[in-house]
């Protein structure tokens, strides 16, 4: 039997001691005191940061929001049904972030940027913080490029520019989402990346929007971020920031992006739920004191980048639902004060058949004609003036029995102008088609037609101009101006089409 000598034993021990490395790993842990309603209270976690991600024993992730003297209030990113009192929690040392890449285009994801469309994982090599600071003053430039929505009423009278924040506000079922989705459809071929964020919506509504995008070929440049009504409040609260992080990724790569939040009032409700459960003091309408900051830090991330940063842009279109037209409620007034203008949708107009139901009188864009091409400025000024005069006259005419000829003519013109603003859903018009439509109306070419004939006449006129006078569209596209040559072509087309139309109607 082999025996070990004493010196061999000492050599082995010495080698082992030399190989030993001291590695101290300090893990910041805590214990669950209480859990329920999407909130957990944790004892310990002494060095946790505000907003840091924490991981529970069974894998659920949470965010530390309340740092109190004897416990930490954590909001859960899942249902947390498996979390038990006394189970351990560890701090991760990370703030919430998501992977980002071009591969997200055409996909439907949740607030954690995980795919929910059943088409497999999304490859990504980079990541971005969900909440990153908004661009500073020096990093921005003023808005000057138009972002066409394809809707005549908006592009002519309430123009939106790239980098602007324009609120879409109105009662339920007035076509708010339709205005936003039409804007996305109109970005086809414009090299604009679109992000649609659905917060607390019905799953069927989101599915309908996604189907529309797929049918119209808009998904190839669109990302849909969805947290439906059955999602935990934490995820509904995070969804808009996830969408903004994805849009920022493209903006800082010198691309133009557009983001729709549908709708921030649902996010505010989710945040109110979280805050009340965390026992934060309630304020007006039981919202917490920092609900303004909730939306301002989100919407301030939309910007037009300076030339040093590559002139990318992020245009934000938040949608807010009002109750019985009350825009003086807390969330609507907050968002109105943060944004650069608002588009009011009226239930009365919607029910009377004027769709999109935009109330032009009280809608406003604070960027104004800086976000219009010259050709649109040339025709839109007259339209806005005539519609304003018509609205005034119409109210007066209800009480007057006998009107003079000039007033009757002005009322007839106004009715036809209002008719030309009507558009079907998912049928956006190009700038050239909009200019032609407005020019026809404001110059009295529709006055001889019956109101019921206006829509049919305009559809045929657009087709006729496209087929027989393609130079018109070329001039508008290249010069962005309604030149004399373009005006001559337009007048010829209107005259020829009017003659054809009258003959058709007679036969």
Swiss-Prot record:
Q: Where is this site: Required for activity?
A: 363
- Gene3D superfamilies hit by this protein: 2.40.30.20, ATP synthase alpha/beta chain, C-terminal domain, P-loop containing nucleotide triphosphate hydrolases
Q: Could you say which residues form the signal peptide?
A: none
The EC category is: translocase
List keywords of the entry alphabetically: ATP synthesis, ATP-binding, CF(1), Chloroplast, Hydrogen ion transport, Ion transport, Membrane, Nucleotide-binding, Plastid, Thylakoid, Translocase, Transport
Show the catalytic activity: ATP + H2O + 4 H(+)(in) = ADP + phosphate + 5 H(+)(out)
Cite the Pfam families for this sequence. ATP-synt_ab, ATP-synt_ab_C, ATP-synt_ab_N
Record's InterPro entries? Answer: ATP_synth_asu-like_sf, ATP_synth_asu_C, ATP_synth_asu_C_sf, ATP_synth_F1_a_nt-bd_dom, ATP_synth_F1_asu, ATPase_a/bsu_AS, ATPase_F1/V1/A1_a/bsu_N, ATPase_F1/V1/A1_a/bsu_N_sf
Q: Which CDD domains does the record cross-reference, listed alphabetically?
A: ATP-synt_F1_alpha_C, ATP-synt_F1_alpha_N, F1-ATPase_alpha_CD
One example of the protein's molecular function in GO is: ADP binding
Q: Which residues cross the membrane?
A: none
* PROSITE patterns linked to this entry: ATPASE_ALPHA_BETA
Q: Where in the cell is it found?
A: Plastid, Chloroplast thylakoid membrane
- Sites binding ATP sit at 170-177
Q: How does it sit in the membrane?
A: Peripheral membrane protein
According to the UniProt entry, what is the EC number of this protein? 7.1.2.2
A cellular component annotation (GO) from this entry: proton-transporting ATP synthase complex
Per the record, the similarity remark reads:
Belongs to the ATPase alpha/beta chains family.
Q: How does it assemble?
A: F-type ATPases have 2 components, CF(1) - the catalytic core - and CF(0) - the membrane proton channel. CF(1) has five subunits: alpha(3), beta(3), gamma(1), delta(1), epsilon(1). CF(0) has four main subunits: a, b, b' and c.
| NCBIfam families listed in its UniProt record | atpA, PRK13343.1
| Protein function | Produces ATP from ADP in the presence of a proton gradient across the membrane. The alpha chain is a regulatory subunit.
Record's protein name? ATP synthase subunit alpha, chloroplastic
Question: Which organism is this protein's natural source?
Answer: Nandina domestica (Heavenly bamboo)
Phylogenetic placement of the source organism: Eukaryota, Viridiplantae, Streptophyta, Embryophyta, Tracheophyta
């Amino acid at each position: 039997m082999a025996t070990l000598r004493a010196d061999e034993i000492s050599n082995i021990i010495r080698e082992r001691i030399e190989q030993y490395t001291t590695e101290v790993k300090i893990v910041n842990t805590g214990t669950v005191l209480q859990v329920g309603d999407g909130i957990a209270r944790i004892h310990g976690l002494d060095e946790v940061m505000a907003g840091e991600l924490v991981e529970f024993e069974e894998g659920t992730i949470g965010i530390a929001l309340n740092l109190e003297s004897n416990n930490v209030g954590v909001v859960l990113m899942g249902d947390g049904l498996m979390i038990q009192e006394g189970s351990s929690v560890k701090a991760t040392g990370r703030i919430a972030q998501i992977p980002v890449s071009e591969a997200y285009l055409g996909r439907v994801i949740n607030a954690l940027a995980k795919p929910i469309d059943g088409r497999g994982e999304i490859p990504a090599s980079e990541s971005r913080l969900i909440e990153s600071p908004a661009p500073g003053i020096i990093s921005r430039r003023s808005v000057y490029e138009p972002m066409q929505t394809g809707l005549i009423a908006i592009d002519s009278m309430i123009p939106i520019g790239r980098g602007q924040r324009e609120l879409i506000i109105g009662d339920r079922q007035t076509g708010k989402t339709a205005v936003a989705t039409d804007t996305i459809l109109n970005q086809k071929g414009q090299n604009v990346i679109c992000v649609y964020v659905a917060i607390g919506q019905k799953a069927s509504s989101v599915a309908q929007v996604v189907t529309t995008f797929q049918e119209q070929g808009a998904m190839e440049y669109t990302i849909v971020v969805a947290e439906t009504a059955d999602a935990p409040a934490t995820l509904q609260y995070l969804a808009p920031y996830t969408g903004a992080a994805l849009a920022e990724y493209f903006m800082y790569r010198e691309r133009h992006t557009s983001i729709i939040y549908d709708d921030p009032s649902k996010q505010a409700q989710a945040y109110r739920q979280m805050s009340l459960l965390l026992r934060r003091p309630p304020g007006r309408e039981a919202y917490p004191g920092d609900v303004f900051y909730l939306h301002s830090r989100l919407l301030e991330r939309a910007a037009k980048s300076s030339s040093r940063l590559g002139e990318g842009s992020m245009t934000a279109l938040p949608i807010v639902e009002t109750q019985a037209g009350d825009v003086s409620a807390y969330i609507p007034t907050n968002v109105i004060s943060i944004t650069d203008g608002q588009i009011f949708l009226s239930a009365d107009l919607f029910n009377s058949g004027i769709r999109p139901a935009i109330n032009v009188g009280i809608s406003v864009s604070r960027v104004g004609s800086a976000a219009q091409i010259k050709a649109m400025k040339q025709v839109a000024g007259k339209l806005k003036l005539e519609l304003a005069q018509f609205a005034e006259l119409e109210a007066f005419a209800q009480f007057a029995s006998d009107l003079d000829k000039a007033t009757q003519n002005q009322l007839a013109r106004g009715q036809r102008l209002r008719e030309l603003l009507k558009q079907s859903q998912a049928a956006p018009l190009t700038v050239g088609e909009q200019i032609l439509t407005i020019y026809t109306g404001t110059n009295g070419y529709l006055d001889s037609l019956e109101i019921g004939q206006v829509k049919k006449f305009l559809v045929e006129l657009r087709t006729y101009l496209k087929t027989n006078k393609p130079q018109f569209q070329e001039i508008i596209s290249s010069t962005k101006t309604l030149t004399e040559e373009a005006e001559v072509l337009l007048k010829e087309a209107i005259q020829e089409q009017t003659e054809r139309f009258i003959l058709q109607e007679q036969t």
